[in-house]
């Protein structure tokens, strides 16, 4: 999760929004990512907020993060940001 956190934490909302569009996240996938990364919720809290089981939430979460990390420039940018 650290690469997706690095990318999300870059602070450039236009790049993040463009990545979401390019990854073709559906509403629930986007909501899952936003609850964990923007609202700092645990997966359990986010699942409750979405009125789904933790297992279903994890399906949304992993689908969303896999789609985002499958975009080559997102992966490269996240790796660059992750270098300390």
Where are these regions (language model features)?
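General nucleic-acid-binding
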Residues: 1-6
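Short, Lys/Arg-enriched N-terminal segment that forms or immediately precedes the first helix
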Residues: 7-22
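Residues marking the start of alpha-helices
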Residues: 20-21, 37, 48
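Short helix-coil-helix linker/hinge
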Residues: 22-30
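Short helix-capping/turn signature of helix-turn-helix
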Residues: 34-41
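Residues within the helices of the helix-turn-helix
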Residues: 44-45
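DNA-recognition helix of helix-turn-helix
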Residues: 50-74
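Short, basic, alpha-helical segments at the C-terminal edge of helix-turn-helix-like DNA-binding modules
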Residues: 73-84
């Amino acid at each position: 999760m650290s690469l997706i956190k690095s990318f999300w934490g870059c602070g450039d909302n236009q790049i993040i929004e463009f990545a979401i569009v390019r990854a073709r996240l559906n509403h629930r996938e986007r909501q899952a990512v936003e609850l964990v990364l923007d609202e700092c919720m645990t997966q359990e809290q986010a699942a409750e907020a979405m009125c789904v089981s933790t297992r279903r939430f994890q399906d949304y979460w992993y689908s969303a993060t896999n789609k985002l990390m499958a975009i080559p420039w997102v992966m490269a940018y996240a790796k660059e940001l992750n270098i300390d």
